[in-house]
Amino acid sequence: MLSQTRAAFFALIIFTFFSGQYAFAGQNTSADSSKMNVYFLSGLGADKRIFSNLKLDDDISVHHIEWAKPLKKETLAHYAGRIISQIDTTKPFQLVGVSFGGMIASEISEIARPEQIVIISSTSTGIPVSRFYRGLTRFLLLSPFAGPILKSANKTTYKYFSATTPESKSLLKAILHDTHTKFLKWALARTGSWEKKQRADNLYHIHGDQDRLIPIKLVKPDQVIAGGGHLMVYIQADEISAILNRKLMQEK
């Protein structure tokens, strides 16, 4: 159990650190009442790049949520309550969240009523961690060296993100460069203490069996992607696209 909690917290540290800067491009599609509004929350970069390889059905109206600057000591629930202003809740909508974005999507579902939540390479509930690793979190939050060290692209980060191609390595390097240190530290503190116990009823979880950041043995996904790592939404986009099109269009 201790080894599992250590692995879980290591995963939380890494994937939270790369949760992205709060300066995204705006929504990329115009409103169309005949289409299903789907809001995408990236956990891995400063913009929608992580979703750039997806091929989605024309009847899906894609919107990208912009990260906001977190308030001091703000909880994930309160943060979700602020960014929900970007969602038109007067019309049916769905949420798709990757990694950290999946956690925020789960918190949004406690406030609004999405038709469905799809999380990818994420967790639907908090993962328990040991006191030792909680202490490690506090140390990293106080260390002036945490940001520069953990924002560097190297063999270790490539390995844990399963960035095996030149294209995926280039993307990961750019993502790390764009990550805002203050956002990074806030996200680390909040995800490390996330205590959500109940999975949302209308949640669908897609996870890779080779995810090194959030090992599959620590979560209970609905759909397992063979050979999928943490960046599978980008690297195995065709397979993920097929699943998303099927699931999202079911609720239309």
Model-found features: residue ranges?
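Catalytic histidine-centered segment of alpha/beta-hydrolase-like enzymes
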Residues: 73-74, 228-243
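Active-site loop/oxyanion-hole signature of alpha/beta-hydrolase fold enzymes
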Residues: 52, 57-94
